[in-house]
């Protein structure tokens, strides 16, 4: 299992557009990928799950992936987070 922690720096947090980009990035991989926030974990391939967390600016989140392509999945999601100015 691979894990990576992020601090959300985007002023609007993870709203509809960035959530869609994260789900699209995660959906390219076979691994199980989850987003954890405030003790709740959701499937990062589910737009409704991601939106239900209500992740705002300043939040600390953890992305975890488990499967054959877990390292590639975490790398791609990290790239998406940074490229979109979502997290550091």
From Swiss-Prot:
Compartments where found: Cytoplasm
Superkingdom to which the source organism belongs: Bacteria
Keywords: Cytoplasm, Phosphoprotein, Phosphotransferase system, Sugar transport, Transcription, Transcription regulation, Transport
Residue positions of the active site: 15
Modified residues (Phosphoserine): 46
Coiled coil: none
UniProt-listed Gene3D superfamilies: HPr-like
Pfam families per the UniProt record, alphabetical: PTS-HPr (PF00381)
Description of how activity is regulated: Phosphorylation on Ser-46 inhibits the phosphoryl transfer from enzyme I to HPr.
A cellular-component GO term for this protein: cytoplasm
Domain (HPr) ranges: 1-88
CDD domains in the record: PTS-HPr_like
GO biological process per UniProt: phosphoenolpyruvate-dependent sugar phosphotransferase system
Function: General (non sugar-specific) component of the phosphoenolpyruvate-dependent sugar phosphotransferase system (sugar PTS). This major carbohydrate active-transport system catalyzes the phosphorylation of incoming sugar substrates concomitantly with their translocation across the cell membrane. The phosphoryl group from phosphoenolpyruvate (PEP) is transferred to the phosphoryl carrier protein HPr by enzyme I. Phospho-HPr then transfers it to the PTS EIIA domain.
Family that this chain belongs to: Belongs to the HPr family.
Family matches, as NCBIfam families: PRK13780.1, PTS_HPr_family
Name of the protein described by the UniProt record: Phosphocarrier protein HPr
């Amino acid at each position: 299992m691979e894990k990576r922690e992020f601090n959300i720096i985007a002023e609007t947090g993870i709203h509809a557009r960035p959530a869609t980009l994260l789900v699209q990035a995660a959906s390219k991989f076979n691994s199980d990928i989850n987003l954890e926030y405030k003790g709740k974990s959701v499937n990062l391939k589910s737009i409704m799950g991601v939106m239900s967390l209500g992740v705002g600016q300043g939040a600390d989140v953890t992305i975890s992936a488990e499967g054959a392509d877990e390292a590639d999945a975490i790398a791609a999601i990290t790239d998406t987070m940074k490229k979109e100015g979502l997290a550091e």
